Amino acid sequence: HGTVVSGTHEAHELDWPEFHNGVASALEIGAANVDSSWIFAHASASRGGRARHAGFLLGLGLHGHLRRLGRVHAYRYLAPRHVLTTVGLVLGLGASFLGTGDAAARQVMAVQVAAFLPPGSVPLHMSTMTQAAGLLGMGLVFCQTDHAWTAMRLASQLDAPMVDTADANEAHRDAYAHSAGLALGLVYLGRARRTSMSSSADHTLLERLCRAVATPLGEASGMAVARTAAASALALALLCLRSGRRDVAEALAPPTPANLAHIRPDLLLVRSLARALVLGDASPSDEWLDSTCAWTHPGDDVPRALAFYQIRAGACLALGLLYAGRADERARALLLRQLSLE
């Protein structure tokens, strides 16, 4: 009716939506032949434009186009230390150089993460989100390479008490720890299925991750323990992907109703997801879905209801991942039925 509605949002609230718009735009390009100068020519100076171009870089990386990005242009993107641009570039490079162990790409990742700098280096005080992207980018570059040194450094960041960062120490720490867990899992992707994991180093790593997942919240700072537990579960999910390791699955199993007070409900989602990915035996049936939780719908018992839905949500996500690309009608129908679960 001619009324002008003015926006009440802050400018920064649109940064991530613009970032995702940029990713979508780049994905439309497909296999087009692009070069370094063409990519850099699309950069923008406006706030929304910078966020959108950051996502554009990630989208190009998903297509592998950032292999053609010159080193000079890469460092021109990194020099202003704009967080979203760095995140988009680092993850895009990681996707473009997936599993190659490329030395130049690794150098870009390592510069973003204080934990990967040589001893005695001048602290760069990167933001926590930038360092989280660097960790995940490192995992992508060394995906399924079993590169032991990189894996060791990533494992050390799962429970790092302090991070040399420009932010308040707790800002985005969950993203940092989860990125370390995912990156560690990527470096050793499917290792438990590909090898016997019989070395002492492998045993030590598995025991460490399983112990972190199972640590009760009362034994240390609740937030730090929960953060490490979730990151360790993600690492186990990828490291033992479809391996059928029952010992690892047992460590990830949901607690009994009597022990629900010792674990946050959201951690149950991650553990349920990881357990299903480790076993790899998901089937699109109500029987399988019911088997993922030790009790049936708890009615009005709120703590048990929260746990029940989180465990079920993790199982549904795992089913979607394991059946991705199959166009399985039974899996689709089962997941749609969960939307009306009461």
Where in this protein do the model-derived segments appear?
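Mature, well-folded catalytic/scaffold domains that follow N-terminal targeting or propeptide regions
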Residues: 1-342
